[in-house]
Amino acid sequence: MSGEIIHSVNPANELGEGIVWDHRSQTLLWTDIHGKKLFRMQWYNFEVTETSVPERLCAFGLTENPEKLIAAFETGFAYFSPATGEIKWLHKTYDVDTPQIRLNDGRMGRDKRFWVGSIVEDDTAPKAKLYALSPNGALNVYRDKIAIANGLGFSPDGQYIYFTDTPNQQIEVSKLTEPLKWHPFATTETHAYPDGATVDKEGNLWSAEWGAGRVTAYRPDGTVILRYPIPATQPSCCTFAGPDLKYLCVTSARVGLSETQISENPKEGSMFILKTDFAGLPEVLFPEKTL
């Protein structure tokens, strides 16, 4: 049945995020940002391993080298080798000693650039940015005056980019030309804050809704197709996975929840796998020529 949860993993993530499917190894990867851990799940047996990281790992993409990730740590962009722990810094964007702002949500674009937005963690003036890291190493800023950058996704033909500044509760879309020109795509309900997102093979946008305990699927025209309930208060990110890319995998978070809320629902902070009637797209690989 579409939307049925077939499996869940409960590592009690403080802030599960950045979930990515690696079709080459048939593994699912995600991060617990605040827990400073990278998780990897083998699809064939659901076995999960975890790797500690030296600073908060906020988002990552796959590269043409299966042993390396293109990573957005809290302070900047780097190549990261999970097996060895090696980090090769490319750009430092923030200072770990001034934690009011850090990198946050990120996705590989169809244009082979690694797009990442940042977040203001102390609720001061919106001063976060949207970055794109090119294969030649160039880092460009495409938007500023952001509070919490989230919801990055790309149409299958690579013509459009989706984005949300979460507190505004509005998903936006722009044609992927320079300069980007943003237009309203969808507005969420009062209790639903759009977080991480993914786009399926048909061009539908799937948005994890923090605070609403669900994932909402939108057609390319912004109308709602369906909503899948998630047994966690704060779904945070999603992606399609599995050999046929027909399973929607959703991370969640415990951060900000009370001890009572967690005791009443121990699945808070879990990663959920749902069977769907939709199919995702393989991840774009960051080119190896710069590795």
What are these regions (language model features)?
Residues 4-10, 46-52, 88-96, 138-144, ...:
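A short beta-strand motif characteristic of beta-propeller blades
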Residues 11-25, 54-70, 96-113, 142-160, ...:
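Beta-rich, blade/repeat-based domains predominating
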Residues 22-23, 28-34, 70-75, 116-124, ...:
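Conserved beta-strand positions in repeat-built beta-propeller and related beta-rich domains
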Residues 37-39, 76, 128-131, 170-172, ...:
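A short loop-to-beta-strand structural motif that recurs across blades of beta-propeller domains
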Residues 42-46, 81-85, 133-137, 175-179, ...:
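Short loop/turn segments that connect beta-strands within beta-propeller blades
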Residues 85-142:
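Hydrophobic alpha-helical segments and helix pairs
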Residues 170, 186-223:
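Loop/turn-rich, solvent-exposed surfaces of beta-rich toroidal or solenoidal domains
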Residues 239-291:
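Blade-level signature of beta-propeller repeat domains, shared across WD40, Kelch, NHL, RCC1
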